[in-house]
Amino acid sequence: MADDLEQQSQGWLSSWLPTWRPTSMSQLKNVEARILQCLQNKFLARYVSLPNQNKIWTVTVSPEQNDRTPLVMVHGFGGGVGLWILNMDSLSARRTLHTFDLLGFGRSSRPAFPRDPEGAEDEFVTSIETWRETMGIPSMILLGHSLGGFLATSYSIKYPDRVKHLILVDPWGFPLRPTNPSEIRAPPAWVKAVASVLGRSNPLAVLRVAGPWGPGLVQRFRPDFKRKFADFFEDDTISEYIYHCNAQNPSGETAFKAMMESFGWARRPMLERIHLIRKDVPITMIYGSDTWIDTSTGKKVKMQRPDSYVRDMEIKGASHHVYADQPHIFNAVVEEICDSVD
C-alpha cells in the first residue's frame, strides 16, 4: 500500500534477505494494527510528511473536548507507538495525545544519520521540531522514555517556548560513565547480552543476523514484555511487534550507537547540559524502583536547577519500563502533572 515504507530492492542480496529475515514493513503494520485495535478512544493513525521527504508515523488520540495543551509521548530505544497501548486511553481522556515513531524507528522513515554524536542527536531533535511545525502544535507537555527522555531534554534546550512541562521517564544518557566499576548498577541480563555482542556492530544486530531465529530471541531475552502486556495480549503480539520494529534497516539504531558510550551511557551526557534548559520550564523525573538506570540523576538535576521546578519520584514495583510495569499508577501520575499545566 502507499502508506507502507517498504525498503527498496538493492539487488540479489535484498531479495534474498526477506527469506532469511522474516520481517517487512507490512508485517510491522499488521502487528501494530492488532495492538491499536485495543484502543477504546477514537484515534487517527497516519504518516506526517516532513519537508525533507521523511515521514513520521503518528498516532493521535483525542477526546471530544480537546482545548487543553496536548501531551506528546516519545518512545525509547527499539520501541514504537504500540508500546504506549496501556497508557493512551487513560492519558487522552481530557486532552489530545500524540505519539509517533522516532525517525529511524518503527514505521517512520529510516534515513542515513550523521555518524557523529552531536550530528545524530541534532537530526533526531530537528525531526521532532519539524514534525511539531507540520502538525501545527503551538506548545506541548513533552514526555520521553529512556532514549526518548534524552531527546526530549535536548529538544527542550533548543525549543523551550514549545514545552509547557518536561516529563522524563527513566531517561537514558544523563550521568557521566563512572570510572569506578563498583559505582555501576548491575544491568539486566538482556543489557549484558547486548553489550557482549556490541563491538563494531549495532546494538540489536543479532536480531537481524539470527534470521528466522530472530523472533525467538526476543521471546528468550525479553519474556518480561509478554507479562507486562498480558492484560491485553495472551499471545506473542508484543514480542512480534518488538521484533519487527528492530529487524528492519537499523537507521535509528545506528544513530543511537553513534550517541552512546557502551550501552548505558551517552557520549554527550545530558547532566552536563541540562542547566541550559530555560529556568521557567518545569521538569518531572519518574523512575521505576527496580530500574537499572541511575536514579540519583533526579537529585543531581535538582542541584543544577535550584531556581527551577524539578520533581523526581519513584514508582514502586516498576523497572525501566515504568509505563508498562505499573500503568495505572503511571497514568495517574502523568494525568496529575498534565492537570497542573491546564
From Swiss-Prot:
**TM segments?**
none
Q: Which reaction does it catalyse?
A: N-hexadecanoyl-1,2-di-(9Z-octadecenoyl)-sn-glycero-3-phosphoethanolamine + H2O = N-hexadecanoyl-1-(9Z-octadecenoyl)-sn-glycero-3-phosphoethanolamine + (9Z)-octadecenoate + H(+); an N-acyl-1,2-diacyl-sn-glycero-3-phosphoethanolamine + H2O = N,1-diacyl-sn-glycero-3-phosphoethanolamine + a fatty acid + H(+); N-hexadecanoyl-1-(9Z-octadecenoyl)-sn-glycero-3-phosphoethanolamine + H2O = N-hexadecanoyl-sn-glycero-3-phosphoethanolamine + (9Z)-octadecenoate + H(+); N-octadecanoyl-1-(9Z-octadecenoyl)-sn-glycero-3-phosphoethanolamine + H2O = N-octadecanoyl-sn-glycero-3-phospho-ethanolamine + (9Z)-octadecenoate + H(+)
Please give the Gene Ontology molecular function terms for this protein: carboxylic ester hydrolase activity; hydrolase activity; lysophosphatidic acid acyltransferase activity; lysophospholipase activity
Cite the EC number.
Answer: 3.1.1.-
Keyword Cell membrane listed? The answer is no
Known Pfam families for this protein? Answer: Abhydrolase_1
Q: Extract the InterPro entries matched here.
A: AB_hydrolase_1, AB_hydrolase_fold
> Does the record bear Transmembrane in its keywords?
no
**Start and end residues of each AB hydrolase-1 domain:** 70-201
List the Gene3D superfamilies hit by this protein, alphabetically: alpha/beta hydrolase
Enzyme class comes to: hydrolase
Per the record, GO CC terms?
Answer: endoplasmic reticulum membrane; lipid droplet; mitochondrion
Recorded hits in SUPFAM superfamilies, A to Z, give: alpha/beta-Hydrolases
Q: Which UniProt keywords apply?
A: Hydrolase, Lipid degradation, Lipid metabolism
Superkingdom of the organism of origin: Eukaryota
- Name the Gene Ontology biological process terms: lipid catabolic process; lipid homeostasis; N-acylphosphatidylethanolamine metabolic process; phosphatidic acid biosynthetic process; phosphatidylethanolamine acyl-chain remodeling
The family note in this entry says:
Belongs to the peptidase S33 family. ABHD4/ABHD5 subfamily.
Job of this protein: Lysophospholipase selective for N-acyl phosphatidylethanolamine (NAPE). Contributes to the biosynthesis of N-acyl ethanolamines, including the endocannabinoid anandamide by hydrolyzing the sn-1 and sn-2 acyl chains from N-acyl phosphatidylethanolamine (NAPE) generating glycerophospho-N-acyl ethanolamine (GP-NAE), an intermediate for N-acyl ethanolamine biosynthesis. Hydrolyzes substrates bearing saturated, monounsaturated, polyunsaturated N-acyl chains.
The name this protein goes by in its record? (Lyso)-N-acylphosphatidylethanolamine lipase
- What gene is this protein translated from? ABHD4
